[in-house]
Amino acid sequence: LECDAFCHEKFFHIYLRNANSQLLVMRPDSDDAGFENVTDHEIKKDTGMNFDMHYYKTTKPSEGMPVAFSVKVDDKNYYMCCEEESGKMIVRFKEGQVPKDISGDSNIIFFKREFNSTKEFKFEYSLEQGMFLAFEPEGIYRKLILKKLSREDEVDETTKIRI
């Protein structure tokens, strides 16, 4: 038996937008992220808007490309992870770098899957089948969350993320 392992392969600088064309912005003061109305002209480097999507090779075949996300804010690097809090899985950002090699399960890996085009995707959390990155309204923006879908082929616009 071979355990799951991930080896960092490459990364790309990207912007993540939801179905409403809002841009994902990470706020280090709250260690979370949300989708906000930001125009292309308002995007600034190292302000939590420009993410890196890290691709990993895996020893186990999977449905979707294993990826992790990181972002730089004020010369500090943060990586996206998922943690349980009060019985609910939440998306967090922690200071540090994504690892080059991961042996076993990891709370930073998501499986990138096509949503309905080559630029729109959904990202399934690697540790819980059927849990996807999504957004929900919270105050003036839409907070990045993990959302359980009842069926894998369910079309849910809140899980659609454009790169």
Ranges and model annotations:
Residues 1-163:
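Lectin-like carbohydrate-binding module/patch detector with strong preference for beta-trefoil
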